[in-house]
């Protein structure tokens, strides 16, 4: 059985992830990252992302194909090798922005987005 530690906003910060690593999970996620903040080169977002041991996964939330693709490419360019798109967050403040589970009804758009991500990201990025 594989053990993945899911992203938890306000909880899975660097210190918490360091403690969790003692239990040898197969994969640990950073806190969810806003695609818009990644694209704006937000200092706090990048400080969070760069303060990691290198093998953590990053889960991105956002809406809009171009914004999401740009964010994924930027994250890949700073060495993040495991990326995940959040399509399940039910929180109202996330859904209001068209992100999280608000993406689910848009099957055609999501298929196009995922195909674009697959074609533009390196084969080394999971």
Predicted regions mapped to residue ranges:
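Hydrophobic "anchor" residues on beta-strands that sit immediately upstream
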Residues: 27, 82, 126
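Alpha-helix-loop-beta-strand connector modules within alpha/beta enzyme cores
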Residues: 46-59, 101-126
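Non-cysteine beta-strand/loop elements that form the S-adenosyl-L-methionine
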Residues: 30, 82-90
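Glycine-rich, positively charged N-terminal anion/phosphate-binding segment
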Residues: 8-78
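Short, charged beta->alpha transition segments
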Residues: 71-78, 82-83, 112-117
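Gly/Ser/Thr-rich beta-alpha loop segments that engage phosphate groups in nucleotides
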Residues: 12, 64, 90, 100-102
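Short acidic, glycine/proline-rich loop/turn micro-motifs
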Residues: 95-99
């Amino acid at each position: 059985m594989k053990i993945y530690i899911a992203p938890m906003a306000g909880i899975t910060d660097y210190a918490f992830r360091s403690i969790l690593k003692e239990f040898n999970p197969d994969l640990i996620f950073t806190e969810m990252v806003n695609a818009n903040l990644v694209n704006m080169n937000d200092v706090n977002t990048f400080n969070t992302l760069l303060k990691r041991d290198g093998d953590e996964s990053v889960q991105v939330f956002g809406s809009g194909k171009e914004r999401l693709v740009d964010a994924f490419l930027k994250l890949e360019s700073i060495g993040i090798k495991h990326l995940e798109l959040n399509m399940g967050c039910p929180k109202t403040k996330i859904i209001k922005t068209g992100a999280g589970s608000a993406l689910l009804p848009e099957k055609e758009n999501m298929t196009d987005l995922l195909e674009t991500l697959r074609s533009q990201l390196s084969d080394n990025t999971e």
